Amino acid sequence: MTIIRKKHPLIKIINHSFIDLPAPSNISSWWNFGSLLGLCLIIQILTGLFLAMHYTSDTSTAFSSVTHICRDVNYGWLIRYMHANGASMFFICLFLHVGRGMYYGSYNMIETWNMGIILLFAVMATAFMGYVLPWGQMSFWGATVITNLLSAIPYIGTTLVEWIWGGFSVDKATLTRFFAFHFILPFIITALVFVHLLFLHETGSNNPTGLNSDADKIPFHPYYTIKDFLGVLILLMGLMILVLFFPDVLGDPDNYTPANPLNTPAHIKPEWYFLFAYAILRSIPNKLGGVLALILSILVLALLPLLHTSKQRGLTFRPITQTMYWILVADLLILTWIGGQPVEYPFIIIGQMASIAYFTIIIILMPMAGMIENNILDLD
């Protein structure tokens, strides 16, 4: 078996990536989320494949086909809710994975980090298009509002929006193409994940100390396969509790009403995992400014390697920047709450202040804190 594992041209790639991979001996449970994201992707692709067998991407039957899946297909309700809540688990793992990368300075592995940002954009695009497919009220109006943002692009904006819609409004053509893209993107994401891993294995994993761990490596299997398996069990337990006991807790009741272009919902809002970005978008009165802020809210992550001023890699031994980091986490929670609130006083001003704080902490305060810590520790 050892001979096959190390000699076979295909199996040896798997061996070098998941079995004999030298890993730091001290990586904590925060390093579990990469494998959990892989699991989430597999769950989403499998459940999505079975949903696609019964779904019809036509405006007149889309809503009914989702109802049919839940009522008439064997375990259709389970597949549908695993897919919907699986997306939420996917984003929870994504945010924790990115947060861990920010905390421990993993963004200094620039190729891996930038590939991760591309993956984040791809997953967000996939989730957005998936939310449109059930063709409920929030699906339709969410698609209308978000695609309409592209009309803010000077000169070509309106033409671009109509091109994406395939007409003069969100209609049958839009739904059909969103289904096509929603189906193909996860496979593109899977390919990008392998590129992400390729870049990661060029440098090796970071660790909680931020120090070079070449002198103290252990094989990935059995140590981290067992550790990842515990994470998998916890994730699956959390997902199944959500699916079997609270399947609709993260959804919007408006999406149980079929799409009606003549009736606008009182509060148009995306799924919970987009609310922080939606709050940043709404906090700027100018349409183009809001769109730019929305894109920059994610793209600002690409600036982190350039904004790294500290002589230390992670935040493990940096209390001032740690404080800034946790204020940023609290700020993101505030933005998520504001994104789900109506556009009125006092939510408008809270959203604007939280949006300013978000960019200020990342671009100004954290780099400044790094320089202060260098001076305190005489690391200059």
UniProtKB/Swiss-Prot annotation:
Keyword field contains Cytoplasm: no
Localization, UniProt: Mitochondrion inner membrane
Residues noted as binding a ubiquinone in the record, renumbered to the chain: H201
Known outcome of mutating I42A: In strain: Isolate AF 3221
Pfam families reported in the protein's UniProt record: Cytochrom_B_C (PF00032), Cytochrome_B (PF00033)
Required cofactor names: heme b
Annotated heme b b566 binding sites: H97, H196
Keyword match Transport: yes
Co-factor remark: Binds 2 heme b groups non-covalently.
Known outcome of mutating M237T: In strain: Isolate AF 3221
PANTHER family for the chain: CYTOCHROME B (PTHR19271:SF16)
Quaternary structure annotation from Swiss-Prot or TrEMBL: The cytochrome bc1 complex contains 11 subunits: 3 respiratory subunits (MT-CYB, CYC1 and UQCRFS1), 2 core proteins (UQCRC1 and UQCRC2) and 6 low-molecular weight proteins (UQCRH/QCR6, UQCRB/QCR7, UQCRQ/QCR8, UQCR10/QCR9, UQCR11/QCR10 and a cleavage product of UQCRFS1). This cytochrome bc1 complex then forms a dimer.
Name the record gives this protein: Cytochrome b
Gene responsible for this protein: MT-CYB
